[in-house]
């Protein structure tokens, strides 16, 4: 059975973003040994609480609007099985495997903090599934982000009792078969365990973290394509002077301006028009890159701070406090912080794509760029980059619609017992699609900017940007005459999505380092 190569050791409550990113990128994880006694004590506390004979939500009562219904001791195991099966009610395509593996790791770290009352064997089952590469098939739709991500996490929990389906090495297998192949026995859930597994914000948080990690790469790629576009248009680097940005004081803006200066350093193209250039100021899409991209960087970092906290939290209900043998009902399952963070990421992704599209539009317009119309040597006979710019506009428009805040919506559920919800799940889930659109826009900009710089030969750009141009030309030749454009765009998109564009220039400001 195929297992992830890298295996991390998670310290519950203190896992850095870099480790969550590594899991998203394919690493596996086990809990630190110090977690197991804490888990065992929490489970023992549940038994002591039950022995008191008092009604405790989710342990010996019904759920949601049915919380007032008392459940007898003989039915406690059935109660937990029933909540898992009845709540596994998601719809839609399966969520991406990297996102669900991240969700599993988040749940693992949450359960290990000793506030959920789950037995050691239950937590070990989840850990073994993660290590062995068993990924539950989790439909992507069905969570409103309070009471946690009930439907998605129920699909995960169902596989642990042998119900549902699991991805293993690219195959989609019945859960019982996949567990058997890995030498694992389906669980019989104990008191509170079903509720503990399915109550929490881990699905929303995993999707938001995935969006954050991809948005960071998008941001860095856009610094590179933006600098290359500035060179193609013979734009000025004066707007990136540090004195300007020091006065504005925003850290992201200051770092972005410094990165753009470094990317364009020692450019022959830039030196060629330092004198005798009649233009006084560049268009905003060039001149205001530090202000726009810096604001995006700052807001991504704010979102990262929120998500780093959420990733290390316990969002179960009720919470078990072994030192007092108490179970306290609260609302940590409400994913409003995640919803806000996802909305911030969506805004940043939208704006990164929006200003990039404006740079493409500037490059294809000879009145603005001074380059041949639509970046073709024979305009009229050839259409050049005319329609790629249209495609970029379409993608940016889609992202503008998707950027509408999810957190401002709420629909009451569970007979108005759960009367305000966060909508964090779909707010976070849209992020990967938005980044995919913006990636395609940057791929188009990469081609357009490289084409524009070609017209300035034999002048060369900076060493960093020449490395990017050489990388681009290794996959896509100069456009002398019209040809089938789609393969060129796909090749450029791959350079953006793979991080190759970033690797070509070296270190850039980031979010999660």
Curated annotation (Swiss-Prot):
A GO term, aspect molecular function: histidine ammonia-lyase activity
- Stored InterPro entries: Aromatic_Lyase, Fumarase/histidase_N, HutH, L-Aspartase-like, Phe/His_NH3-lyase_AS
* Pathway(s) this gene product operates in, as recorded in its UniProt entry: Amino-acid degradation; L-histidine degradation into L-glutamate; N-formimidoyl-L-glutamate from L-histidine: step 1/3
**Residues that span the membrane, as ranges:** none
One Gene Ontology term, aspect cellular component:
cytoplasm
Q: Where is this cross-link: 5-imidazolinone (Ala-Gly)?
A: 146-148
The cross-references to PROSITE patterns, in alphabetical order and at most eight, read:
PAL_HISTIDASE (PS00488)
Q: Which GO terms describe its biological process?
A: L-histidine catabolic process to glutamate and formamide; L-histidine catabolic process to glutamate and formate
Sorted alphabetically, which keywords does the UniProt record give? Cytoplasm, Histidine metabolism, Lyase
Enzyme Commission number(s) of this protein? 4.3.1.3
Catalytic activity reported? L-histidine = trans-urocanate + NH4(+)
Query: How is the protein altered post-translationally, as described in the entry?
Result: Contains an active site 4-methylidene-imidazol-5-one (MIO), which is formed autocatalytically by cyclization and dehydration of residues Ala-Ser-Gly.
For this protein, the record's Pfam families field holds: Lyase_aromatic (PF00221)
> Is the Cytoplasm keyword given for this protein?
yes
Give its localization: Cytoplasm
Is Endoplasmic reticulum set as a keyword in this record? no
Identify residues that carry 2,3-didehydroalanine (Ser): 147
The cross-references to PANTHER family, in alphabetical order and at most eight, read: HISTIDINE AMMONIA-LYASE
| Similarity-based family | Belongs to the PAL/histidase family.
Name of the protein this chain belongs to:
Histidine ammonia-lyase
Q: Which organism is it from?
A: Caulobacter vibrioides (strain NA1000 / CB15N) (Caulobacter crescentus)
């Amino acid at each position: 059975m195929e297992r992830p190569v890298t295996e991390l050791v998670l310290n519950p409550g203190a896992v850095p973003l870099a480790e969550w990113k590594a899991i998203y990128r394919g690493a596996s994880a086990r809990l630190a040994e110090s977690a197991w006694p804490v888990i065992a004590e929490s489970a023992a506390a549940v038994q002591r609480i039950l022995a008191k004979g008092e009604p405790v939500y989710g342990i010996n009562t019904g759920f949601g609007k049915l919380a007032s219904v008392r459940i007898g001791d003989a039915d406690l195991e059935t109660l937990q099985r029933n909540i898992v099966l009845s709540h596994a009610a998601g719809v839609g395509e399966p969520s991406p495997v990297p996102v669900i593996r991240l969700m599993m790791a988040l749940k693992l770290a949450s359960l290990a903090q000793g506030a959920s009352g789950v037995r050691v064997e239950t937590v070990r089952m989840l850990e073994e599934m993660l290590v062995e590469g068993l990924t539950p098939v989790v439909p992507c739709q069905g969570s409103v982000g309070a009471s946690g991500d009930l439907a998605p996490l129920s699909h995960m929990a169902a596989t642990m009792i042998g119900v549902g389906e699991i991805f293993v090495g690219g195959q989609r297998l019945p859960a019982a078969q996949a567990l058997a192949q890995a030498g694992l026995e389906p669980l019989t859930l104990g008191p509170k365990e079903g509720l503990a597994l399915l109550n929490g914000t881990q699905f929303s948080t995993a999707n938001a973290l995935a969006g954050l990690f991809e948005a960071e790469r998008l941001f860095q790629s856009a610094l590179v394509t933006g600098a290359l576009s500035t060179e193609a248009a013979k734009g000025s680097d004066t707007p990136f002077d540090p004195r300007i940005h020091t006065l504005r004081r925003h850290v992201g803006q200051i770092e972005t301006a410094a990165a753009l200066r470094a990317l364009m350093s020692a450019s022959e193209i830039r030196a060629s028009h330092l004198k005798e250039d009649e233009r006084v100021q560049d268009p905003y899409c060039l001149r205001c890159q530090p202000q726009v991209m810096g604001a995006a960087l700052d807001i991504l970092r704010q979102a990262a701070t929120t998500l780093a906290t959420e990733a290390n939290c316990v969002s179960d209900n009720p919470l078990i406090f072994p030192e007092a043998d108490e179970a306290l009902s609260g609302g940590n399952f409400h994913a409003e912080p995640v919803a806000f963070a996802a909305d911030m990421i969506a805004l940043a992704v939208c704006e990164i794509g929006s200003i990039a599209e404006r740079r493409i539009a500037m490059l294809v317009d000879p009145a603005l760029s001074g380059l041949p119309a639509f970046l073709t040597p024979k305009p009229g006979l050839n259409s050049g980059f005319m329609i790629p710019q249209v495609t970029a506009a379409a993608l940016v428009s889609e992202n503008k619609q998707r950027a509408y805040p999810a957190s401002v919506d709420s629909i009451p559920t569970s007979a108005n017992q759960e009367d305000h919800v966060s909508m964090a799940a779909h707010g976070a889930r849209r992020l990967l699609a938005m980044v995919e659109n913006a990636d395609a826009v940057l791929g188009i900009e990469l081609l357009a900017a490289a084409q524009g710089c070609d017209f300035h030969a034999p002048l060369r750009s900076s060493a960093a940007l020449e490395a990017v141009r050489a990388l681009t030309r290794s996959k896509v030749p100069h456009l002398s005459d019209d040809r089938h454009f789609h393969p060129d765009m796909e090749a450029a998109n791959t350079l953006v999505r793979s991080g190759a564009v970033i690797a070509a220039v070296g270190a850039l400001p980031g979010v999660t380092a």
